[in-house]
Amino acid sequence: MPAQARDERGLSESTQWAVLFSLLMLLTLGIIQGGIHLHGRNVAQRAATAAVDAARGSFGSTAEAQQIAQGIAQSGGLDEVTVHINRGATTVTADVTGTAPAILDILSRIHETASAPLERMTQP
């Protein structure tokens, strides 16, 4: 007596769902990672802007500006934060670099820069 043919459609359907579910999970994690990266860029930009604002005044110091930027960046969730402030003759520039939390280990390094003219006292 010949063996009857078995219907294997259920197996291929479950394989399709496994592949589809994996792709959906990867997409979801990618969207979350993108949001974390954008948040990290916002935090780094805010830290750089605050540092420039603190250092550009007539009596502003780069050390105080560096502390302010470090505090903002670390409280915003960035790790391994480095802040470099360059106070030139006419402008001040702040570079903030840090690492955002990573789910997929991509887009974790963040670097933002802000600059502004120095405030000077002038005689009318």
Regions found by a protein language model. Give the residues of each.
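Short, conserved structural patches
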Residues: G60-P124
